């Protein structure tokens, strides 16, 4: 399970899903 961390520059993958600007996805 990975997440998409949204930045102004673009998207970056992350394994952690803390509450905030991160959107979790089951598959990536």
From Swiss-Prot:
Its tissue distribution reads: Expressed by the venom gland.
GO cellular component terms, A-Z: extracellular region
> Disulfide bond among the record's keywords?
yes
| Keywords on record | Acetylcholine receptor inhibiting toxin, Disulfide bond, Ion channel impairing toxin, Neurotoxin, Postsynaptic neurotoxin, Secreted, Toxin
Location comes to:
Secreted
Stored InterPro entries:
Snake_toxin-like_sf (IPR045860)
Question: What task does this protein carry out?
Answer: Binds and may inhibit nicotinic acetylcholine receptors (nAChR).
Task: Give the family per the record.
Answer: Belongs to the three-finger toxin family. Short-chain subfamily.
Q: Which organism is it from?
A: Micrurus nigrocinctus (Central American coral snake)
Q: Name one GO molecular function term.
A: ion channel regulator activity
Output the superkingdom of the source species.
Eukaryota
Under the heading Gene3D superfamilies, the entry gives: CD59
Disulphide-bonded residues: 3-24
Q: Does the keyword Lipid metabolism apply?
A: no
Q: What is this protein called?
A: Nicotinic acetylcholine receptor-binding protein Mnn-3C
């Amino acid at each position: 399970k990975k997440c998409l961390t949204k930045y102004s520059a673009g998207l970056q993958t992350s394994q952690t899903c803390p509450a905030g600007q991160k959107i979790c996805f089951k598959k990536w």
